[in-house]
Amino acid sequence: MIKIKNLKKYYGKELVINDVSLEIKKGEIYAIVGHSGAGKSTLLRCINGLENYQEGSLKVFDQEIKDLSQKKSKELRMLRKDIGMIFQNFALMERKNVFENVAMPLRTHYTQCKFHAKLFNKEYMSEKEIAQKVNSLLEIVGLDHKNKSYPRELSGGQKQRVAIARALALNPKILLSDEATSALDPNTTKNILELISKINAEFGITVVLVTHEMDVVKDIAQKALLLEHGQIIGSGAIDELFLRPNAKMKEFLGESDFLPEHGLNIKLYFPKEVAQNSVITHMARTLNIDFNIVWGKIEKLNGKALGNLVININEKDKDKVLDYIEKSGVLWEVAS
């Protein structure tokens, strides 16, 4: 659905997106993560054609965005119809009520005059159909009782729900979210993420999240890409990224391993199918050995509890311990 290969984007002489490649498949929730200035919002704006890029390829629905931006404005407008977007600041019209804000894309894209539709070859939607569509969207986001309210009368979470309804008005296949929860409190953030997950599951909409909030990524993303100074420092499935981070990712996440100098340190990764099993206690009893637990942590990733653990064993027990671990289905590596 979205394929990016060796993408480079410059602002003047400054390289802000540096050789980025990724693929986002239909129906995925994909996070683009980074600190402020990492280039994540710029990358998002390249995806929907709001920013040009100088090198590489960026295809959405198998269409090269650069070609559409430069030569085919009508095709680019049609592509954007299939891409909804929500923002940190909600981007609502303050002088229009909730209903009118959500109806705006429909009234802009469609004509409400059959004569104009025929004369100018435009798509037609009646006011009755618009009202039905808007009311349906407001029901989906839980704001059907607020249709006549104005943005100033809404909480931050309610404003974002209006923005989500508006983004869904033209039945997009992709929903882009640019720091959509960063201005919200934790409880409201949780509710908005649940709504986005529901929309993804029920309508099959591909979701691309730009965020600096790790909890957002862990809550709903299936895959992620981590950017630093416009470069990828990690990408892949969420459990792999957070349970087996590389050195750059550990630095990015502010993590470090403190390990004993004596004995053999083994880091264990518990995939979802064995995360709840008492592998370690069974191993101690079966092999009749002693070992120390150095540290461990459990992460809730996409609603599943996954964990890793570092144990310190005697060097003489290495072969039988590793053989037991292999047979248990637990992933491992010698930590150093």
Swiss-Prot record:
Keyword ATP-binding: yes
Localisation per UniProt entry: Cell inner membrane
Residue ranges annotated for the ABC transporter domain, each copy included: 2-254
Subunit and partners: The complex is composed of two ATP-binding proteins (MetN), two transmembrane proteins (MetI) and a solute-binding protein (MetQ).
Catalysed conversion reaction: L-methionine(out) + ATP + H2O = L-methionine(in) + ADP + phosphate + H(+); D-methionine(out) + ATP + H2O = D-methionine(in) + ADP + phosphate + H(+)
Membrane topology listed for this record: Peripheral membrane protein
One example GO MF annotation: ATP hydrolysis activity
GO CC term (a single one): plasma membrane
Protein name: Methionine import ATP-binding protein MetN
Major subcellular site: membrane
Residues at which ATP binds: 34-41
Function: Part of the ABC transporter complex MetNIQ involved in methionine import. Responsible for energy coupling to the transport system.
Gene3D superfamilies per the UniProt record, alphabetical: 3.30.70.260, P-loop containing nucleotide triphosphate hydrolases
InterPro entries: AAA+_ATPase, ABC_transporter-like_ATP-bd, ABC_transporter-like_CS, ACT-like_dom_sf, MetN_ABC_transporter-like, NIL_domain, P-loop_NTPase
Listed EC numbers: 7.4.2.11
Record's keyword terms, sorted: Amino-acid transport, ATP-binding, Cell inner membrane, Cell membrane, Membrane, Nucleotide-binding, Translocase, Transport
